[in-house]
A protein has these predicted regions:
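A short, Lys/Arg-rich alpha-helix, primarily the initiator
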Residues: 1-21
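Helix-turn-helix DNA-binding elements, focusing on the entry/boundary residues of the two helices
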Residues: 14, 25, 41, 56-59
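Residues in the recognition helix of alpha-helical DNA-binding motifs
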Residues: 17, 31, 47, 76
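The alpha-helix within a helix-turn-helix
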Residues: 18, 29, 33, 63
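Short alpha-helical DNA-recognition segment
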Residues: 23-46
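DNA major-groove recognition helix of helix-turn-helix/homeodomain DNA-binding modules
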Residues: 51, 55-72
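Short amphipathic recognition helices of helix-turn-helix/homeodomain-type DNA-binding modules
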Residues: 72-79
Length: 79
């Protein structure tokens, strides 16, 4: 049976999308909060560095903020 590796690339893909929009973490968090997603700076930083998992609702909001397809965050994931 294959072991599933942590979703290491999701955080990296989030960071790439944020850079692509020219946003800082603080600006991204402010936009998330305007959409009703309560998240702290430390939590967001942990998501981008793959130390904690992200909620689906947060991914959906980020896809709208960064104007990317939801599937973008799952590119280059490996088992």
């Amino acid at each position: 049976m294959l072991k599933i590796r942590p979703d290491r690339n999701i955080g990296s893909n989030i960071q790439k999308a944020r850079y692509g929009k020219g946003l800082t973490q603080d600006e991204t968090i402010a936009k998330l909060q305007l959409m009703g997603i309560e998240i702290s700076r430390s939590t967001y930083a942990k998501i981008e560095t793959n130390r904690i998992n992200i909620r689906v609702s947060e991914l959906i909001a980020l896809s709208k903020i960064f104007d990317v397809d939801f599937n973008y965050f799952f590119e280059d994931l490996t088992l």
